Amino acid sequence: MQSISLTALAEEQLTLARQARSGRAARTIHGGHEHALRQTVLALLSGHELAEHDSPGEATLQVLRGHVRLTTARDAWEGTVGDGVTIPPERHALAAVEDSVVLLTVVTPRPPGLS
């Protein structure tokens, strides 16, 4: 069993985001190309965003710190610490209303050869 402190990782990623010109930093804590499930801790500084992009598959977003806004062409959701949302299977963007950290969980089709 592997465990991690999401609180400590959130602080680490916020520190890295503050040093990055993009105003963001991320670390995958589970998954990758060999797994169907992927979890990523993503820090975004206030006023920065992940521009509109296609949905990577079935996904959820949980706010670990701060305040974020998830938008699609037809809808918008705002979340703060402890809030979560199922990301719709359409193009969307994520913006930080204040310095924020989220846990993004994505399920993608299993690669060939994995069962």
Task: Report residues per predicted region.
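A cytosolic small-molecule/anion-sensing beta-strand core signal
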Residues: L64-R65, T80-V81, E98
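Conserved short histidine dyad/triad with adjacent acidic residue
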Residues: G23-A26, R38-S55, P89
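Short beta-strand segments in beta-sandwich/barrel cores
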Residues: H48-L50, G66-T71, H92
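Glycine- and acidic-residue-biased ligand/ion/polar-headgroup-sensing regions
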Residues: G57-A73
